[in-house]
Every structure is written in C-alpha cells, then in structure tokens.
Amino acid sequence: MIKEVVKITNVNSDVYRGCKYLAELVIIMNGEPATIFVGFKDNYPGSLPLFFDLNDSFGRIPHKEKDGFICFTRSEAIVIDKRYPVSLLLNCLENVIELIAKGISGENHEDFQLEFEAYWCHIVKGKIYGAIDTDNYNVREINLWCETSESNFTIVASEKNIKNTEVIMNTLFHIDIYQEEKFRCIYIPLKHGTSILPPAAEEEWDYSFVKNIFSKHITKKSKQKFQRIIRRKGNSTKKLEFIIFGLPISNENTALFAYVMPGTGIDYLHPLVQKPKNVNLIPLMVERWHPNYLLNRTGGNTEVADKHVAIVGVGSVGSEIATRFAKSGVQHITVIDNDILEMDNVYRHALGNDSVYARNEDNQLINVPKVLALEKEIRRKYPFIQVTSLPKSFVELWEEGSINWKDYDLLVIAIGLANQEMDINEKMHSMKQPPPTIYAWNEPLGIGGHSLITLNNEKKGCYQCLFKPMEGKTIHNRSSFTKPNQDFSKDLTGCGSIYVPYSFLDSEKTAMLVVENSLKLLTGKLQDNPLLSWKGDDSQLKSEGFATSHRYSSNKDK
C-alpha cells in the first residue's frame, strides 16, 4: 500500500489543520505511484490522522477541500485503539484510497451534489438566516429584512405564511422588523434532475453562469410565476435584489444557495431578466431555521405539526409533558390549570425560580399562574409553537361550555388527584365524540409512574375502572405499585405544606412515557387503549417502612 515515506520538517500547524507532524506518502493508485500527505496532531493516536492532496495529484474529486484536505469520514466513526497506531493509520489510509479511487472513476460524482452547500461555503461573502420551506416547489416571494449598523449587517428571511413573524424575529435574532429595511427576495426551486457542480475553491460564478442556471433549470410554469411576481405593482426593488435557489439532491433534500445583486433601476424589471450596469453578484449562504428543517434535523416529527393537544394540570408531570410536546413538533398546545406556581415546587417543575413571581399593575409582587408562566417559557424557547393558556380548572371550563373538547386531537390529564380525574373520565365518556384522553400520574418515592390511554379508536379504556371496588376491600388504584391504605404524604411546616414525595426524575420518566405513546397515537401507530407503566427501584420506599403491591412484585421487568 505504501511504497515510500518522507518526513516533512518545519510544519506550520495552522496551515495543516492543527497537525504538528507531516509525512509524504508514495502510494499505488490504479497501478501507478501517487503522492499523498498525512498529518498527525499532538494527541495521535488519540485522534485520527488527516490526509491531504497538497500536489493536486488527483484533480477535482468529491470530499476534497480547497486546502487539499480529504474528508474520508463524516465523524469519528472509526474506533480508535491507541495500542495500535500503525493499524489505525493503515485502516484510515485504506478508506482514503477507496474514496480517491471512486472520485477518479466518477463513481461518487453525485457526492458533489450532496456536499453542495459545504463547497458553497468556501466562496460566500455573507449569510442569510432563512426560514425556507424546501418542500414547497413553487417559485415565490420570501420576506427579507436587512439590519444594518456600523458594526453589523444581518439578513433574515422567512416564508410569508409563518405566523407571529415579528415575535419570532425578535426572539431568535433580536431585531425589530418594523425598524429594518425590507427587500424583495424570490425563492427559485430548480427542476428535479438538475446537475450543477458546486464552484471550485475560490471560483465565483459570473452573471452569465447564474443566468444560465435560471434559464435552463427551471420549468416553464416557474418562469411564468417569476414574471408575475416581478410585474406586481409596487413590487420592484431598485436598490438590491435577493435570490435563493433550491437545488434538489439525490437524498430527497434540497441544497440552498443565494445571491444578492443590484436592482435594474427600472420598475418591473429583474436583473435575471436584464443585466444591470456594473453588475456585481455577491454569493450568500443560507443558514436555515424553518421549523420543518429544525424538527427533521433534531429528530422531531413533522407528522404532528397540525395536531392540537391539551394538557389539564401543568404541575410537575404536566409541565414536563407540555415542553416535550413542544420539542416533538406539536404546533398547538393548550395548557389548563387554575393553580399558581410556588417556590416550593420549582425543583420538580419544568419552570424555574425566575417564573414564580411577577409585578401587577400596582407593582405588588404576586405568584404567576402556572399556565401563563409555562406559555411564556415555551414561546421563548420555541417561538413557532402556538400556546393557549387557560388559568381555570377543568370543571370551570366544562360548566361554562366555552370549549369544544372534540376539537382537540388529544387530551392529557395530569392533575394527579384521583377523585378529580374520575370526574373528568365520566364527563369524557358522556360525550358523543370525545378526543382520545390520556391520564398520567406518578407514584411516591421513585417506585414508578403510569399512563392510561382511553377513548382511542374504539373508544374503550376507562380511568375509573382502575378503582373498581372489590368485595371486602377498600377502593384503591389497582395499577398501583404500592400496597393499598398507606399514607405517603409529608409536610415540612404543617398542613399547609403537605406533599407527596417524588423527584423531578420521576416526573420526567412519566412525561416521556406519555409523550412517546401520544406521538404514536397521533400518527396512527397506536390503535388500542393500554395501561403503560415504568417501574422504579423499591429500596427507598422500603427503607421508609412502606410495602409494594402484588403488581409490583409480580412484574419483574423494569
């Protein structure tokens, strides 16, 4: 594999990506000798060797960057065993040679498309923070604002159908769109099957090349739509024009690249139609923030974006459930609770100390309702989410008749009080078209937590049935992991501070159980009405003199 090794002296680590040591290797490629360089960082073999084509021996191939660096692995996918540094080098070199061979033969030519944005970044002179829906294949106008100051120039763009744009812009980018200059930006999706090589290092496409992309790689329908956009009355921008191209790539994704260019100075005439005098094309990258992209990027679920979930009770368990629904991609969440947030609860609540108090109109310090504090926090973290907060009890809302409960795709009950939840269960079962309803609760001292799904599909499942009386025994929850008739309540300063002991970890486990199965329900993957439980360790419970139930003892799974 290696025919010759020559050590390079006086290595500039800044030039060679942190490598302190460099060697020239003569290898055999397609039966002929070829030169490649390998670099080692100080901590080798604790890190992978880096390979460079410094002499441009292999021409332009995918995964080779402008400094000659050959990116042969996306991550530290190769397991490193420090005991065998030579084997590590040879293993990596095999991968590099295979990658180069595919590049020379053209076998991985489509990787140029897959890595288009990575190459594009090498030539850009600015950035657009863009919320672009790449699943929409129509030519269309995009909102775009430029914030300029003596030391800063920020360009932000968003689809016109994104709600609460001004709030989102202020939350994410700290700009006031009403104070910034607005420019026309047109999104142009290129035809499927379009093949465009990304620009080589430090190569910039000229006006003719960009116009050729526009002329040859969009559909007739797209051209007609483009003409309608630029001819709209009052829609011309004489100063600057922004264009964002969407290039379909083979993994069903879309690469984005953008330009800003001077306007034509003529109403209803775009620079891609008529070349302006002294045209200067400035390439821009697009940093994405569209909610669909962010959800796909982080494992969220776009299938539930149109779902509306209501959570009744946003204490320790309910608040964790609400925040996890927001992270999961549910775009409309209603939170219902008439309780206030208190300092006593923050260490097992999704909200922290800073959410407990606020000042009223008379500047008096007051406790904030849980739902209002939770709405504020979710909106701050996830501004795309629509949150409706109702600081009332379920009973109040039911008696008012102000809510059409069947409009919810899912109802989660996390009050943690059996009598109230049995009442809700009765009311839900009395409806003609009740929404699927899930009940969630913790048990004390880390022994477990539960989630009961009801009214899903065949409208079966009943919370109250868990408390069905048995002859000679008091009523108790038959799903419980604790023996009946035990009092777990504690107090620190008297009756006013009574609480049931469980930790934030218990609430998070129960919330995860609920949300995981709720997502299955909302996407049609869960058809029945199961009782689901997580089983914890019983050591603390027993150390305090309590006993477990037969269900806990007979269920050996945790």
Residue ranges and their predicted role:
Residues R297-I340:
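Glycine-rich adenosine-cofactor-binding loop
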Residues P391-F394:
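Conserved acidic residues
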Residues I340-P383:
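Glycine-rich phosphate-binding loop and adjoining beta1-alpha1-beta2 segment
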Residues A255-V309:
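N-terminal charged helix/coil linker that caps or initiates catalytic domains
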Residues H122-D267, K406-L410, A414-K558:
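Glycine-rich phosphate/adenylate-binding loop
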Residues E65-E76, I80-I123:
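Domain-level detector for trafficking modules
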Residues L397-K406:
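Short amphipathic alpha-helix with an adjacent loop that forms part of the alpha/beta core around
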Residues N10-A77, P85-L90:
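Compact alpha/beta protein-protein interaction domains typified by the UBC
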